[in-house]
Amino acid sequence: METLPTDVSRETRERLETLLALVGKWTRRINLVAPSTVEDGWRRHILDSLQVHRTAPAARHWADLGTGGGFPGLVIAILEAERRAPAQVTLVESDRRKCTFLRTALRETGAHASVIDARIESVPPLGADVVSARALAPLDTLLGFAHRHCAPGGTALFPKGARWPEEIAAAERDWTFSAEPIPSITDPDAVLLRIGGIAPHAG
């Protein structure tokens, strides 16, 4: 097992182990994650999702968009269960097979989240304090989703690869926003973009 922070409880570690086992099992049937990443799942998926959670401000409502195979959304739900006042977690996913997996994983890990089976752009604004999305779309598209679903003053968290500066430059053509690149703990070329103040350009 990849090293987890020492403040993660044994119960949470067991829930994360259960999640990874489920991902490995279901990936053989539906395309949850790239099969090549399953063996290195602690680093590629669990730790990568954990850093998203650790970077976020305390939230009353967290929305994970395009949750897919459960990262970071299911990990967020598992970690929030440790908190005295856990956030309401909403997972948005349009693929019904993946929604079935998400509900199964929530049941088997004992985590709590709402699963919305719909396209992100068709979901009524969620008013979330924190919005996250991983490996979903270019930044300019993600900003549109975040602008729709973030509460005023909310934060968006988007893991991005080595070309993140180009994505920021492209997004700045249509959006005003602040972006803080935080070095990834799982990939030296990647960052976690912490974004706020999202507004479309006038006209």
Region roles according to the model:
Residues 153-164:
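Conserved beta-strand signature within the Rossmann-like core of class I S-adenosyl-L-methionine
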Residues 136, 140-143:
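Alpha-helical transmembrane segments of helical membrane proteins, especially in multi-pass transport
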Residues 86-87, 152-154:
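A short helix->loop->beta-strand "cap" motif at the edges of active sites that frequently abuts
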Residues 1-63, 96-111:
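Class I SAM-dependent transferase core
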Residues 57, 151, 172:
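Short conserved AdoMet
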Residues 143-153:
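A short glycine-rich, Lys/Arg-flanked "PGG" loop and its adjoining helix->strand segment in the class I
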Residues 50-133:
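Conserved SAM/SAH cofactor-binding pocket of Class I
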Residues 163-203:
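Active-site capping/gating segments
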